């Protein structure tokens, strides 16, 4: 996916309200982001229509539905250290498991911040555990926390976590 402020929001909007079961996104350079997304479809035909629709919007789509390696391993490996990324802030956030929660979050951000990383997977509980990165200064952390508070999405800043420093 092309990496620019608002591209994540635009992609989620292109899904037209479909249920997202998993979303792994990582900035991987000035103009590129790696995305691994699980979207609920009702049939093989529905999946093919979605792929054609997204391809028509210039998204590069690779259907990994039948890949056991992707389902068992690759989904957890999207990302790594982002080259040339400065001022990244990491948040661990609880999203309510309800339709539109992600889109509401992106809409409230209003294109003010470049999202550099996003990891979510539906585990069937009342809240989804999300890890999200923003390209922003330390001082902008308070604004992001305020936005999350307004949405009632509890969060914890993880920028100084050893796991983040070592792997991401």
Where are these predicted regions, by residue range?
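A conserved regulatory-domain signal marking ACT and ACT-like small-molecule sensing domains
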Residues: 1-168
């Amino acid at each position: 996916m092309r990496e620019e402020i608002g591209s994540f929001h635009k992609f989620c909007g292109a899904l037209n309200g479909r249920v997202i079961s998993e979303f792994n996104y990582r900035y991987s350079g000035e103009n590129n982001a790696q995305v691994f997304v699980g979207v609920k479809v009702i049939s093989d035909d529905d999946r093919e229509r979605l792929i054609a629709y997204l391809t028509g919007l210039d998204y590069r789509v690779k259907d990994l539905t039948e890949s056991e390696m992707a389902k068992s391993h690759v989904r957890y490996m999207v990302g790594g250290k982002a080259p040339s990324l400065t001022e990244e802030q990491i948040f661990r956030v609880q999203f309510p498991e309800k339709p539109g929660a992600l889109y509401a979050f992106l809409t409230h951000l209003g294109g003010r911040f470049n999202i550099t990383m996003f990891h979510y997977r539906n585990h069937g509980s009342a809240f989804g555990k999300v890890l999200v990165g923003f390209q922003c200064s330390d001082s902008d952390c308070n604004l992001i926390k305020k936005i999350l508070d307004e949405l009632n999405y509890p969060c914890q800043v993880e920028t100084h976590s050893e796991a983040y420093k070592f792997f991401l």
